[in-house]
Regions:
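Short, solvent-exposed loop/turn motifs
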Residues: 41, 53, 83-86, 190, ...
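Glycine-rich, aromatic-lined ligand/substrate-binding cores of catalytic
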Residues: 854-886
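Extracellular/periplasmic, surface-exposed regions of secreted and cell-surface proteins
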Residues: 134, 181, 313, 363-372, ...
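Extracytoplasmic gating/loop element in the C-terminal half of outer-membrane beta-barrel translocons
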Residues: 275-278, 407-415, 424-426, 430, ...
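Conserved small-residue
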Residues: 240-292, 390-391, 738, 755-854, ...
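Short, small/polar-rich motifs associated with maturation and membrane association
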Residues: 2-360, 374, 733, 837, ...
């Protein structure tokens, strides 16, 4: 018995030893799990000790506490939508986990046309933008932040003027002449892209092929952009405030020559033309030394009207929270961007440009029943744009018209200088500072109501009924307060009285007042039936819907334009996949538009797509190759954007045509005549699109690659008939429209991303994307030209027709031994052209299509992000290629059109052909003439430049304060950052921004922005 008791206690002791040992070696680890970018806490994240059953989850503040027993153990943290992260426990009592968002995880739901799908099962071509990268751009309009960020999007910012700085966007290039802009939907409703505050955006999808856009039918040919705004999430109330202060520095102002150089150039022109010189050396010296600034002025007009720096501020306050029943998201935003125009401080009003935007958005979701929920979205956008009394284009035109010696800013008597020549009578300075101001106000009220009814319990699992209704009201109001100060032309002092002599140019007028207003409304309704269900390894889905949109312009100028614009139709989708291995989709849209005649209003647009995922096959055992999907699609989509003219199938009558004199009073009685000739068979464009793509993920999904080849054949493009015989008997503008245009468009796009977080918490992301899209004209109804190289067919749309320049004539012998140029008189130093048809003469038959189109055929972007212990650095580059720009004619033709009035740019002066110079072989511009030189005033490769560029578009360095600091401050997150926008540009132009419309002096400069910002969460 005694031995038995001893054995029992020994056994009990041996059993207890491991337990005691565990108890003695256990210790607690605490910490916080938060978003690496926003520093907001992550609720419900799983925290596990690797290779054990020890685990916990984070609370509402993202905090966790776990008891572990091994300093060599590894903690693994995972959360939905984030990449998992591991850290060695060691002897640390506090371990924080900054999780990185899992960009487009295969299990994530991606927004598609009228629904969502798992990324793993998508067979169409679509891309989602990383809004974290987009938000790093301080551009005041969203469209300017997209180029080089999203594959498939080609963008160009034509101007930097506040309020008029939106970029032109195309998806996969240009496939039509009429309207190549994509359809933009915000929360499923057709709304403006540039009025959305980027901080309000939850997801941004770009639909590119027919499979992705077929449900939009005759609106889907140009691609679709889907923006989904943020919604509330269950949890405690979160308040986020973000503020930015930006210094904007103007880039590449137009640079003109000084007064004495202008006078010298006038003398040089007269020497070349063999006429008397207008200026003596003594007079030229007065322009240089400023000894007589009224009769011999030297005005730098650019410096007088443009300042170097401006200011921008952006602020957003958002509140989100709720529970399982009610969830809400509310956001308030304010943005203000000032312009670069100088002002007269003596006025009580501003003449500078300024753009202000006020944003309010509220999204509320309510679960009324476990199977029934409703949503209400409200938004109010107010945008105020202020400009000088004269528009920017007029001001920049005047900058190149008024020379530095034309007249002084002010005359001796204090009046403003001017000239009696009509287009020179007002100076750029007066236009900017003393011409009054214009104020535009746009107000948009948006309301969206939605309801979802889960019919799973009532009919069958996976069935859902959904409906949406929206109402948008837009109101525009403008006020014009123009004024004209007293303007005189000073012609010197009276030799007898000594008083100044003047020619009156313009009397002073009081500030005027005029205003205008217009408004419009849009209604949208849709009703959808959704079905999604999995049977073992078979997953099927379906969607069928009806939608209708009506738009009314309440300020229409005539009864036709006042009629409502209506579109309606049905759309559907069927999806099937087997074990996420074999994928198949069918999409269609059947839409109608009242733009066309009865019998022509409705069209059917189907598309099919399929995919195969070899990495899901049982025989796939390539561990480092995590995912491979091959997909393809083919379908038809349409474009019913036929311009501003409505009802092109109807003929119109001009009631104010030429008439006759009637009666004794000889009153004019107007006649009636046929006006626009209608065509009752008009229809929409049809684009037949093919897409083949591949998606890959490697190295534990650290590396992601996707690429697509696309081809589009678009016919029935609406064009006004051009090749009409004279016997037709009507003016060109009366000729009917017809669906006769044909264009093809093909190319490739793709992206790569390498993202990882090391065990020590170092985060890095390397990414790149590209888009190449080239169109070809097949038919545009133009007449067959005299020479085959002048035919538009077979060329890219948008190419300029011009001469091929062979440089400048260097000698008379070269002129004598060259083909005769019939474009005007020419001499040594003038442009030499190529004789394309070899007939010995240079004339209009020697023109061909030159360069590349203004929109780039190739666009790309790449970037880097690094983060460690709260610090992060992000760089994003954007580039474009295969694009050309023509030098603005009036900027580069010296004394353009009217010697000697027009200004002369520094670029021309420093690179011109100089008579008598030792070497003119490197001269880029022709010799100057005292008068017009039509030989040189031709569109040619001499004035064509390569507009390719690479920009450091954004750079941001930031610090997210660590949990122990923000806990002391009793806040959830705190981030400080320094941001740069448009920091560097590598290109061969240097005169203007390479994205501008013209290479010269008529574009408002873009700006470099340096921003200091703060984001705090409560």
């Amino acid at each position: 018995m005694k031995n038995t008791c001893v054995k029992f206690f020994v056994a009990l002791l041996l059993f207890a030893l491991p337990v005691a040992a565990f108890a003695q070696n256990t210790f607690k680890v605490t910490g916080k799990v938060y978003d690496a970018q926003t520093h907001e806490p992550i609720i419900g994240a799983g925290v596990m000790m690797k290779a054990s059953n020890i685990g916990t989850i984070t609370d509402l503040d993202g905090n966790y506490e776990i008891t572990v027993n091994d300093t060599k153990g590894i903690l693994v943290v995972s959360a939905i939508g984030y990449e998992p992260m591991e850290m060695l426990i060691g002897k640390k009592a506090v371990i924080n986990f900054p999780l990185v968002q899992d960009v487009e995880s295969l299990e994530d739901a991606v927004v598609v046309g009228y629904g969502t799908q798992k990324k793993a099962t998508i067979t169409g071509s679509l891309t989602t933008a990383n809004m974290t990268d987009v938000a790093k751009s301080t551009a005041p309009t969203l469209s300017n932040a997209l180029g080089g960020v999203v594959p498939g999007i080609i963008s160009r910012q034509r101007s930097g003027e506040p309020g008029n700085d939106a970029a032109v966007l195309q998806i996969r290039g240009v496939g039509t002449w009429v309207n190549s802009s994509p359809l933009v939907l915000v929360d499923g409703i057709e709304r403006s892209l540039n009025y959305v505050n980027p901080e309000e955006i939850e997801s941004f999808s770009v639909l590119k092929d027919a499979s992705a856009t077929a449900v939009y039918g005759m609106r889907g040919a140009n691609g679709v952009i889907l923006i989904t705004t943020k919604k509330g999430k269950a949890g405690k109330v979160k308040v986020t405030f973000r503020t930015e202060a930006t210094n904007l520095h103007g880039l590449r102002f137009p640079e003109y020559i000084e007064g004495y150089e202008f006078a010298n150039l006038m003398n040089e022109a007269c020497t070349v033309s063999g006429v008397a010189l207008p200026w003596t050396d003594e007079q030229i010296e007065k322009f240089r030394d400023g000894s007589d600034p009224y009769l011999y002025p030297n005005v730098d007009w650019t410096n007088e009207v443009l300042k170097k720096d401006a200011f921008q501020t952006t602020n957003t306050l958002s509140v989100t929270g709720g529970n399982e029943t009610v969830r809400y998201y509310v956001s308030l935003g304010y943005m203000s961007t000032s312009g670069l125009w100088k002002e007269d401080p003596s006025f009580g009003y501003s003449t500078n440009a300024r753009s202000q935007r006020y944003n309010f958005r509220s999204n509320v979701d309510i679960n009324l029943h476990k199977n029934f929920s409703i949503s209400l979205g409200l938004a109010e956008i107010v945008r105020e744009n202020d400009f000088p009394g004269y528009g920017a284009q007029d001001i920049f035109f005047q900058l190149k018209r008024v020379s530095p010696i034309a007249y002084p800013i002010e005359n001796p008597d204090g009046s403003f200088g001017g000239a009696t020549t009509s287009y020179l009578n007002v100076s750029p300075y007066v236009m900017v500072t003393n011409g009054g101001f214009i104020k535009y106000t746009h107000t948009s009220t948006q309301a969206t109501f939605g309801a979802k009814w889960d019919l799973g319990d009532l009919i069958t699992p996976g069935l859902q009924l959904e409906g949406n209704y929206s109402f948008d009201h837009n109101y525009n109001h403008n006020v014009v307060r123009r004024k004209d100060p007293l303007i005189k032309q000073y012609v010197g002092d009276d030799p007898v009285t000594g008083e100044g002599r003047y020619n009156l140019v313009r009397e002073e007028t009081a500030m005027g007042y005029s205003w205008g207003a217009d408004s419009n409304r849009a209604y949208y309704l849709d009703l959808r039936l959704n079905y999604n269900r999995t049977f073992n390894e078979h997953t099927v889905g379906a969607m069928f819907m009806f939608n209708r949109r009506e738009y009314i312009n309440y300020a229409a100028g005539n009864s036709t334009a006042a009629l409502p614009y209506r579109r309606q139709g049905i759309a559907g989708r069927i999806t099937y996949n087997y074990a996420q291995r074999y994928l198949f989709d069918v999409n269609f849209g059947y839409n109608g538009s009242e733009n066309f005649a009865k019998g022509q209003r409705y069209g059917f647009f189907p598309a099919v797509s399929a995919g195969w995922v070899p990495s899901e096959e049982k025989w796939w055992n390539v561990n480092w190759f995590n995912h491979l999907k091959i997909r393809g699609s083919y379908g038809m989509v349409g474009n019913d954007s036929i311009g501003s003219d409505r009802f092109g199938y109807l003929s119109t009558v001009n009631k104010a045509a030429a008439g006759y004199l009637y009666g004794q009073s000889q009153s004019v009685i107007n006649g009636m005549a046929e006006d626009q000739i209608g065509a009752d068979n008009l229809s929409w464009e049809v684009a037949r699109k093919t897409d083949v793509g591949i998606d890959m993920e490697f190295a534990n999904r650290i590396v992601r690659i996707s690429a697509d080849y696309f081809y589009e054949y678009r016919d029935k493009i609406l064009l006004q008939r051009a090749a009409m015989p004279d016997i037709f008997g009507a003016a060109w503008e009366q000729t009917p429209y017809a669906n006769i245009g044909i264009m093809t468009n093909q190319g490739v796009d793709g992206q790569i991303e390498i993202t990882n977080t090391t065990k020590k918490g170092f985060y890095y992301s390397i990414r790149g994307n590209f888009t190449y899209a080239k169109n070809t004209i097949v038919e545009d109804d133009t007449a067959k030209p005299a020479e085959p190289y002048m035919d538009t067919r077979g060329n890219v749309a948008g190419l300029p027709l011009g001469y091929v320049a062979l440089g400048l004539f260097q000698s008379q012998d070269e002129i004598d031994n060259s083909p005769k140029q019939e474009l005007g008189t020419y001499t040594v130093g003038d442009i030499k052209y190529k004789d394309l048809n070899g007939d010995g003469y240079i004339n209009s038959n020697d023109r061909t299509f030159i360069g590349y189109p203004r929109h780039p055929l190739f666009m790309y972007g790449f970037g880097f992000t690094f983060g460690y212990k709260g610090f992060d650095l992000s760089l994003n580059f954007t580039g474009a290629g295969l694009t050309s720009i023509l030098i603005d004619a009036e900027s580069m033709w010296p004394f353009s059109l009217d010697y000697p009035a027009y200004n002369v740019m520094r670029e021309y002066y420093d690179n011109r052909f100089v008579p008598g110079a030792a070497d003119n072989s490197k001269a880029k511009y022709p010799v100057v003439h005292a008068g017009t030189s039509s030989n040189n005033y031709q569109i040619s490769t001499q004035y064509l430049r390569n507009a390719s560029y690479l920009k450091l578009k954004t750079a941001e360095f930031g610090y997210n304060f660590q949990p122990k600091v923000i806990n002391k401050l009793k806040i959830e997150s705190l981030r400080l950052f320094l941001n740069g926008n448009n920091l560097l540009c590598f290109d061969g132009i240097k005169l203007v921004d390479p994205e501008s419309d013209h290479l010269g002096s008529s574009s408002y400069p873009t700006q470099r922005g340096i921003t200091v910002g703060l984001q705090v969460g409560f």
